[in-house]
């Protein structure tokens, strides 16, 4: 430990103690909050089923920065590099298209064995795994419908894919001793004015009921469902809207996924957390950064990221909210994107843990909104960075921007050699 870091740490402890905050306790609490990193930042959502195929489903990864992962071994190596630069507990979020098999596997036939390498790798790296069926980038999703498809056979294919995915998810949880959160998102919708908005939603409702009909151990697997406002090519109508999934999660008591980019640009998911928690047992968060639309830019340490973290901490939702990330920027170094976004999420959680929430609640309850605002603003200037640097030190990760040197070295040695 450097003398400078130690001095800053001691001063920070004193400053926070003066407002009633135990920084050691804050760091212990931070270690209770894993962040689930998404594997698809590493290869622009290509996967291993058909890596040269087009990305569909109304989503886009823009940019052509060199060095993207082309295989499972490359993706895992890149992930290890990123993980080594991020302090504290982490998980990995996989999509079904990241299966490994020597022969082609139909999506409705995926099995735990196709993800065995991921499980062994997760064990070696002390990670939990989360999962997602991949209802996009496939010939049977080409017309924009999957679980809500009017064709019985196509709809059944996607139902079977999601059912198979649940068994993979349960396998993750059983093998790793921590439940896998499996999120169902489908791109189903229409580009232009839609006359019958009810029938597709009725089909989606019935399909989802069939998907979750198999009873699985909740210690191994958690179901989540995710809404969206619109996607490219589905601007006018999305079957799985916010109202649809809020009703579904409430009535079926599944987890509800809130994606920061899946709402109108004037809406924020931080304001939805406390409302949804009154009705659903769990929330899954996809923390992202929408720029004018669901662009999935790298997460910043901005007001909304901080507000999301503060909602989790202020209401003690540690055991009911699962924090995941969802962004994919192909215009910058992909490992750096992981590191920047994940570290920012963790910084926001730390800052929330360093807030004198009890004092602020008292001021609010007494109607002293002047003092509430004053303290909230003064809080921003307290030396949280020194606490963050100590946290990084204890987890053997770079405290400041030194991590970029490691990324550049890896880029020169490994990424630059990829065609």
Curated annotation (Swiss-Prot):
A Pfam match: RhaA
InterPro entries recorded: L-rhamnose_isomerase, Rhamnose_isomerase, Xyl_isomerase-like_sf
Single GO cellular component term: cytoplasm
Binding locations of Mn(2+): 262, 294, 296
GO molecular function: L-rhamnose isomerase activity; manganese ion binding
Catalytic activity, EC: 5.3.1.14
Cofactor binding note from Swiss-Prot or TrEMBL: Binds 1 Mn(2+) ion per subunit.
UniProt-listed GO biological process terms: L-lyxose metabolic process; rhamnose catabolic process
Pathway: Carbohydrate degradation; L-rhamnose degradation; glycerone phosphate from L-rhamnose: step 1/3
Keywords carried by this UniProt record: Cytoplasm, Isomerase, Manganese, Metal-binding, Rhamnose metabolism
Catalyses which reaction(s): L-rhamnopyranose = L-rhamnulose
Compartment(s) where it occurs, according to its Swiss-Prot or TrEMBL record: Cytoplasm
Main location (coarse class): cytoplasm
Cofactor(s), names only, from the UniProt record: Mn(2+)
Keyword Metal-binding: yes
HAMAP family given in the database record: RhaA
Quaternary structure and partners: Homotetramer.
Family affiliation: Belongs to the rhamnose isomerase family.
Function: Catalyzes the interconversion of L-rhamnose and L-rhamnulose.
Cited NCBIfam families: PRK01076.1, rhaA
Protein name: L-rhamnose isomerase
Source organism: Citrobacter koseri (strain ATCC BAA-895 / CDC 4225-83 / SGSC4696)
Organism ancestry: Bacteria, Pseudomonadati, Pseudomonadota, Gammaproteobacteria, Enterobacterales
